[in-house]
Amino acid sequence: MKKWMLGLVAMLVLVACDDGVKKDYLENGNIKSELRYENGKLNGESVWYTQKGQLAVKGTYKDDVLDGTYTRWHPNGKMASEEHYVNGKLDGEVKKWFDNGQLFQEGQYAEGMMDGQWFIFYPSGALAGKAEYKMGTGKQVCYEESGYKCLEVPYVDNLKQGREIYYNPDGRITKIVEYEKGKVVSEENDPQNEEE
């Protein structure tokens, strides 16, 4: 009985020692990470740094699971992405940026599923794609930087599903790729030429 109690006390001491902020350092002396623990699990805001000591990643956790804002930075210090999580699932606004600060992508998630309007941009700021989703189901339309529609992609449950259709500048179909649950099942090049 005494050994069992002693083992339990030792375990509680070990768990208690894991609480608080744990800082790790790189060989060059710069801080690598500041991780916040409670009851031996990541809880609260944790931060990771680059070799040069700049912010790399900052995330909010609850019991080892992302729950809150998760932000990444490019090596040049500009923000790379900002996402929001609820109980480990993407939920809310998502934004991503090129390393020059220009917006790359913005959209919404609901319970881990793409939801609402999404936009993708070229580094020039020109529209590269747009989509409308309802809980992971919808269609993405992509554009060449010159403005013509070059691609249509259907999605179901956040995965490509159905016919992905490629277009040339004249609007002619140049390729069709068939998807089943995100995996390619067939591919047809220049299907309109075969019909002529």
Predicted features along the sequence, with ranges:
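Sec-dependent N-terminal signal peptides
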Residues: 4-14
